[in-house]
Amino acid sequence: NDGHPVNPHMPVADLTGSMTALAAILMALLRREKTGKGDIIDISMQDSTMAWLPNVVGPVFAEDRAPIISNERSFGGYAFFSIYKTADARHVTLGGVEPKFARNLLTDFGRPDLLKIAISPPGSTQDPLKAFLRETFERHTLKYWVKWFKNRDICFAPVLNLHEAWN
């Protein structure tokens, strides 16, 4: 209601636990088929969910610290993995941090000089690029941007409400 996108409120632990269980069941069936022996399957929703967090657990293991969420790739630490407001108070999202997508967009925007920032690690180093993208996307409406991005090799999507997403 406040005009900002929200998390989709997906039951993530249920989903990851279910996918882990499915994989375990299929492997157990294959083992039974090949060896005639069964398996005991013990699935933890917590463990299943933790296995899906490789993008945010790097600091925990590599640097022995808690992640700074706003600096992490999956939470907007990269300018090219963020959500931006448009002129009509709608939103667009970029989802490709690979250099080719950054190069394509920044070249089309006439700012290839920002590529060095785009390919730098996530975090505050991305702030100047985020500011540029924020200012750029706020110049036009969502409809304009959807048309502008058509047939461009850039990971872009409009942020839709649930009704729009189903239609």
Segments from the language model and where they lie:
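Active-site-adjacent "lid/gating" segments in soluble enzymes
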Residues: 1-96
